[in-house]
Curated annotation (Swiss-Prot):
The chain crosses the membrane at residues 17-33. It comes from Guillardia theta (Cryptophyte). Heme binds at H21. Belongs to the PsbE/PsbF family. GO terms for molecular function: electron transfer activity; heme binding; iron ion binding. GO terms for cellular component: chloroplast thylakoid membrane; photosystem II reaction center. Its main location: plastid. It is a single-pass membrane protein. Its cofactor is heme b. The keyword RNA-binding does not apply. It is found in: Plastid, Chloroplast thylakoid membrane. This is Cytochrome b559 subunit beta. Heterodimer of an alpha subunit and a beta subunit. PSII is composed of 1 copy each of membrane proteins PsbA, PsbB, PsbC, PsbD, PsbE, PsbF, PsbH, PsbI, PsbJ, PsbK, PsbL, PsbM, PsbT, PsbX, PsbY, PsbZ, Psb30/Ycf12, at least 3 peripheral proteins of the oxygen-evolving complex and a large number of cofactors. It forms dimeric complexes. The keyword Transferase does not apply.
Amino acid sequence: MSKIKQPISYPIFTFRWLAIHGLAVPTVFFLGAITSMQFIQR
């Protein structure tokens, strides 16, 4: 009974985690690139 209810809640949490990380990782990378570019220009 507990195993049937767990897989339903697990994919939703995984999808949300993937969406947050998928958006956060490139944003941090982009911010780092902008900061690096400004440091090189200065």
